[in-house]
């Protein structure tokens, strides 16, 4: 594997780890997650549609990072598990995708979407549910700060 891919995978794993551990306090859902043998993380990416290449490659990198963490023993002995969801490269679908991940799949964090428009549609849902969202590719300056206010549950690399 090329060096930059190793560095990118390690950086993504570190970012996911930091977000997961930051979001592990309080709440029944978080208590349930703390008692299981795995940490369930949602991945809402553009797997079909106009920008599917962005989503597919980012999901591939996330899987590599999670595999490395799991091979090293996981986080506090717990394995990471990804629940994938295709937002079809559409902001309205991104909202639906993230809603399902948060409310039905009960993930403790969401990685993705890849594009700024899909992230913008997703952050109100994750914020309302106090679930961290990591936007690994989105570039809009309003992803993490809007009107001078830092978004508490949104992280960008």
Task: Specify the residue positions occupied by each region the protein language model found.
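Extracytoplasmic "Venus flytrap"
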Residues: 35, 42-63, 85-92, 114-115
